[in-house]
Amino acid sequence: MARAIRLLAAKPRSIGEIRERLLEKNWTDAAIVDGVIEKLREYNYLDDDQYARDLALSKLRQKPQGRRRLQQRLSHKKLDRSTLDTAIKAAYETLPESDLIDTAIEKRVRLKGVPATHEERKKFTEHLMRQGFDYSLIREKLQQLEIDAAAPSNKLA
């Protein structure tokens, strides 16, 4: 029990991660670990639903990313599929994907400028796809960016 509490004190973990870490030691067996996990759940030290929601929001606030990338990152945390899906849905209700892609586009434009050539647009699109954003959303936002970029030059002429 003390080892489990020390692990949780270091950082929040899922039930699967705690189970794996406790079973690493030769002196533990599955029955003891299951008992410890049950006690931790009674004390509300372990809650996969809350852990998944907090982690999803934290990842989105750290760096804007699309659903695919977030799902891939959270899948390594040994959470069941329904918990992951619920947490991701809740995170994107709080921080809409269209706002996140706008933030990612603004950052990229600030660093590299508005893509002018076909090759630059292709690289920009690939960058956003690697961030996990959906292609249709990327295409829509980049078309809007090109319209916005062309608009000021028309006013000057």
Place the predicted regions along the sequence by residue.
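An alpha-helical, amphipathic repeat domain used for nucleic-acid recognition
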Residues: 1-157
